[in-house]
Each structure stands twice: as C-alpha cells, then as structure tokens.
Amino acid sequence: MSKKSLKIITLGDSYVGKTSVFNNFVTGKYEINECTVSPSFYSKTLTIENEPVILNVWDTCSQERFNGLSPIYYRWSNCYTLCFDIHNEKSFKNLDKWMDEARKFCIGKVPFVLIGTKKDIPRTDKSISKERIEQWCKNIEDQGIIDRVHYFETSAKFSQNITESYNAALKLALEHYNKNQKPPITTPAIDSLQEVKPGYCC
C-alpha cells in the first residue's frame, strides 16, 4: 500500500517569526540567526491510525520579498499555517492577502491553521487584541471560507503551542487528503533535517 503524502506550507510576512516556529517544530530548539531567503523543507514519515503517512512541510521564508510566491509552493497543498506577529499591526492586516494568495493557487478548499507568534512578549496597547483576532476568525467562518478557524498563540522561544498547532494542521491535512485524494507530491531528494537551517526572523 502506497503512503499518503501530505503537504503543509507556512505563510506570513517576513520577521513575524514563522521560521522560528517552523524550526522549533522540526528540531525542538530555538536559535537566533540571520534571516534566510531560501525556503526550507522538512519531511518525515509518521504513523497515523496504523497507517504510514509522509508529512512534507515547507517554510516559504522570505520568498514574499519577490513578486509573490511561486505557485509551485502552493501546488497540491493539503493545509497551510498562516502566521502573524500578535504585536505587529501590519502582519495582522496582511493575513487576508496571504489567504487570498493561497486560495488563488491551491486546488480546492484548503484548510489552514492561524498562528499568532511571540506570545512570550507581554502585550501592549499596540498589540493585536484577542477580541480582534476572534472577530477576524468569525468573519472567515461567516464567509464560508472554512468551517472553523483553528487558532494558536505560540512562543518559539519557550516552545509554547508549537506541537499543538502543527498537530492540528496535520489532522486537517489528512482530512483534506482523504477528501481529495491528491497525487503524490514531488519533493527534493534531500535529507530534510539537514536542509532545515534554524533562523529567527522570517
């Protein structure tokens, strides 16, 4: 029996900390480094309900610096994580832009997990209030874009809600795959753990 191959991509503005979240999920560590501009790729075989599943996670990193992401990063995605900095107004407002781009290039109704980063930093008057975030989620649900928005506030520095957010994404990705039966994903012939380069800013 062939293994199911699931693809999850990570989206969000530069410097919101999405690469730190990604690296923490992959390595369990938090490291500060210079921002990288090439996407990172991670692949691992998991067993879910006694069935082998290949999980492929793409961190798009700073590809948004160019004229939009290449459609290749979106192709055959089963779920995406949408990241913003809970202390950065612009990154919150740009969630709609990222979601629109994902909906444009992804095939079918692809689910997503909303991730707020830098939970370890105390909120101030300039931070995004939980009420605004809840309202954004409600608006998305009311529009029928997704039945339920799964939202997690995370801290890569202290490994808070990292595993939980990606477990939710994995569950949604598997449900999407089972409904759509996508063809296998072509992935680079690399050792994915070596390809992941810990970084802070993207």
From Swiss-Prot:
It is a lipid-anchor. GO terms for molecular function: GTP binding; GTPase activity. One of its GO terms (biological process) is hypotonic response. It is found in: Cell membrane. GTP binds at residues 12-19, 59-63, 117-120. The keyword Nucleotide-binding applies. The keyword Repeat does not apply. A motif (Effector region) lies at residues 34-41. One of its GO terms (cellular component) is late endosome. Keywords: Cell membrane, GTP-binding, Lipoprotein, Membrane, Nucleotide-binding, Prenylation. A lipid is attached at C201, C202 (S-geranylgeranyl cysteine). Belongs to the small GTPase superfamily. Rab family. PANTHER family: RAB FAMILY (PTHR47981), RAS-RELATED PROTEIN RAB-7A (PTHR47981:SF20). This is Ras-related protein RabM. The gene is rabM.
